[in-house]
Amino acid sequence: MNNGVSQESSVLLDLASHVNRFAFDSFRSDNNKTLLSNFLHFNGNTRTGAAAAKRGVSLGGKVGGASVRFGNILNDFNRAVRFHCEKIPIGFASLRVGDGGDGADGNGNGEGNGVRVDECGGVENEGFRGNGVEGEKPKKVLILMSDTGGGHRASAEAIKAAFYQEFGDDYQVFVTDLWADHTPWPFNQLPRSYSFLVKHGPLWKMTYYGTAPRVVHQSNFAATGTFIAREVAKGLMKYQPDIIISVHPLMQHVPLRILRSKGLLKKIVFTTVITDLSTCHPTWFHKLVTRCYCPTTDVAQRALKAGLQQSQIKIFGLPVRPSFVKPVQPKDELRRELGMDEDLPAVLLMGGGEGMGPIEATARALGDSLYDENIGAPVGQILVICGRNKKLANKLSSINWKVPVQVKGFVTKMEECMGACDCIITKAGPGTIAEAQIRGLPIILNDYIAGQEAGNVPYVVENGCGKFSKSPKDIAKIVAEWFGPKAYELQQMSQNALRLARPDAVFKIVHDLHELVRQRSYLPEYSCTA
């Protein structure tokens, strides 16, 4: 593990090389820290005017092995934060983004009320004026996401498609990666950092669980906001949104703080659409949202414990692409279109958008288990989705299989692939689970990401719509039994999956949003032209 981290050519190593170019003469970096984990800890009071705020960030936890190198990198970044804040005091202080103090009531009626960002990023005090006219132009929806895993973008695109399908040109919907598109380096490297951390499980677990305590992630956002508030404000305001939808746990805190300081919380509908089915990072929940759309009752209970009111919470399900709601073609027709055998039962083997996981080993095991040596014929077939992994697709296509096997790359009509099959093997991604339930597919989970996907395993297993195993041989045995002596179990799990399915979730979400924005009598007027 240590060698893997030391040899990884990643954004984090690039981060170290950049921050070491700074000249420091007063801040000491130690290997032994006493705080909880690798979080940014904000310390110091916000001051405006000539007295600039001094802030620092700390890396906590006593770590060893591969994590020591990771810790040293963030220690160097810690020094960069202190240096940058002392020399270039920008961000919340210069934007006058307060926390509701100094007479503020949380809606901009206090210090910081009425500020705006001009095209050059400067601050003006003319405020955001309601135009006094009912909305005649298309209303604008801004969806905040990040490409940290495929599920956030998939949910964003599903919501966008549902708005267009239900309301046509009445809404203009924009999808933006807030961190990648509207924050400076190194914060715009978030997707790359996530990919690195997920590949190294212990580092990801340290990050996920270490930032879970409220005191930790609030300090993190406070320090981070020092650098990104100006850019984020410009990014938000240039879209002039009537509705802002966050489909990512890191897209609530800084935008909401900016909107509150500008007095826009009652003018712009800000909502969160949670894309995790069970285990949720606490950063998903913020008390200032207009709505928090939860996919399950378990997530709704977590929202209540986080301090949200019942009136803020709606349990509609996980938004999936509207195409999954359309009538399903018969299996034999779909199989014929996909080049599959029309009569044999089929298993769908997926590895996500990047074709990750033990796909080849599982496919080979299935090839053996689905061939009956006694009759010399296959008892099932395999549809493999390799995503963008062309090397894997080519390798699987070159194998001389004993059973019918169809190998696909990146597909856009997943509803057809699922509709052609009788069960699915996949990692515990929430979007794939929700889509499989809509199609009534029993699910075999073969892996999960620690933290946000860990709860999806008991969600599937305990609700009787699937099983979990990391062993390719055990998985192949389960499928062979489902296609043979345990066909009754396959049928029961299919019914359980359909019972949990919420195919209309995305439509309920957009209609509720439409009603919320309709209740707003005035539309805000913006001045940022950046």
From Swiss-Prot:
Keywords of the record: Chloroplast, Glycosyltransferase, Membrane, Plastid, Transferase, Transit peptide
Origin species: Glycine max (Soybean)
Gene: MGD A
Gene Ontology BP, a term: glycolipid biosynthetic process
GO CC term (a single one): chloroplast membrane
EC number(s) reported in the record: 2.4.1.46
Name the UniProt record assigns to this protein: Probable monogalactosyldiacylglycerol synthase, chloroplastic
Function: Involved in the synthesis of the major structural component of photosynthetic membranes.
Transit peptide, residues from-to: 1-105
Subcellular compartments: Plastid, Chloroplast membrane
Keyword Chloroplast found: yes
Reactions performed catalytically: a 1,2-diacyl-sn-glycerol + UDP-alpha-D-galactose = a 1,2-diacyl-3-O-(beta-D-galactosyl)-sn-glycerol + UDP + H(+)
Molecular function as annotated in GO: 1,2-diacylglycerol 3-beta-galactosyltransferase activity
InterPro entries: Diacylglyc_glucosyltr_N, Glyco_trans_28_C, Glycosyltransf_28_UgtP
Major site of localization recorded for this protein: plastid
Family stated for the protein in its record: Belongs to the glycosyltransferase 28 family.
